[in-house]
Amino acid sequence: MFQELLATKESKTGTVRFIAIDGRGGSGKSTVAKLLAGELGAEIIQADDFASWENPTDWWPLVIERVFQPITNGASELSYPRSKWWPNHHPEPVVDQPVTPIMILEGVTALRKEFRPYISLGIYVDTPTDTCIRRGIGRDLTNNTGMTKKEIIKLWEKWVLEEDVYTHRDNPKAYADIVVDGTRPLQDQLA
């Protein structure tokens, strides 16, 4: 399904076709991205490498500057600093990533209006907000964040408000070429 649809879409960045996978935090975007990357031989750019709790949705200029513009200018590899989410989070400071004919941008706000000139195919993972919150808190509690459950819940309450503002402003679900149900296995939806 995805290969056939992507074959009908032109690159907007020269030779690379970008797939954007959007949805709420905890919706299942990363799962969809990993499945597609394996199927399509694509590299995944994670919005989480740019976003943070302090700047959950307005990090987009960094992606244009460090991802879309270099690829449009013919870059064969990307290199960009990675943000830090948690007190105990010590990721590799820089991401070095090859550019492939298909690239996937995965994360909350991946279908924002500022990215649309670069996106060949948009996917929205539609999952009820309460399910997303439950999944997100559960994930964050197991990630050695250095934070208490109460602190994580407070961050998620703020996060949902930021997502609501973005969703109302940019309406990513309406822009998506494909909407998948984040509560069902992707393979079941492709049959």
Question: Predicted regions span which residues?
Answer:
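ATP-dependent NMP and nucleoside kinases share a basic, alpha-helical "lid"
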Residues: 89-142
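Extreme N-terminal, non-catalytic leader segments
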Residues: 1-19
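Conserved beta-strand scaffold positions in the cores of enzyme catalytic domains, especially
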Residues: 18, 42-44, 122-124, 177-179
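Conserved nucleotide-sensing/catalytic segment adjacent to the nucleotide-binding pocket
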Residues: 43-105
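Small-molecule kinase domains that catalyze NTP-dependent phosphoryl transfer to phosphate-bearing small molecules
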Residues: 145-191
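P-loop (Walker A) phosphate-binding loop of NTP-binding proteins
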Residues: 24
